[in-house]
From Swiss-Prot:
Protein keywords: Acetylcholine receptor inhibiting toxin, Disulfide bond, Ion channel impairing toxin, Neurotoxin, Postsynaptic neurotoxin, Secreted, Signal, Toxin
Purpose of the protein: Binds to muscle nicotinic acetylcholine receptor (nAChR) and inhibit acetylcholine from binding to the receptor, thereby impairing neuromuscular transmission.
Cellular localization per UniProt: Secreted
Molecular function via GO: acetylcholine receptor inhibitor activity; ion channel regulator activity; toxin activity
UniProt-recorded name of the protein: Short neurotoxin 3FTx-Oxy3
UniProt xrefs under Pfam families: Toxin_cobra-type
Gene Ontology cellular component terms for the protein in this record: extracellular region
Family that this chain belongs to: Belongs to the three-finger toxin family. Short-chain subfamily. Type I alpha-neurotoxin sub-subfamily.
Domain of life of the organism encoding this protein: Eukaryota
Leader sequence segment: 1-21
Principal localisation: secreted
Positions in coiled-coil regions: none
Length: 83
């Protein structure tokens, strides 16, 4: 009986942990705030900032992409942390 109970507890913990999905902001520059649920396995959000002839551009989303020189990138690991 104790073995069965322990097995059920372990299975529950594993299933709850695997079911977590990250939520990140995904609006661009000065648009209204919107969020997206990241695909499975993605555990970070990013915000990229750069300037061009239009002014300061901000891009947000899921993951932590590589960037070119001159682009500031911030990656973080909690829900909606990329505001």
């Amino acid at each position: 009986m104790k073995t069965l109970l322990l097995t059920l507890v372990v299975v529950t913990i594993v299933c709850l942990d695997l079911g977590y999905t990250m939520t990140c902001y995904n609006q661009q520059s000065s648009q209204a705030k919107t969020t997206t649920t990241c695909s499975g396995g993605v555990s970070s959000c990013y915000r990229k900032t750069w300037s061009d002839i239009r002014g300061t551009i901000i891009e947000r989303g899921c993951g932590c992409p590589s960037v070119k020189k001159g682009i500031e990138r911030i990656c973080c690991g909690t829900d909606k942390c990329n505001n």
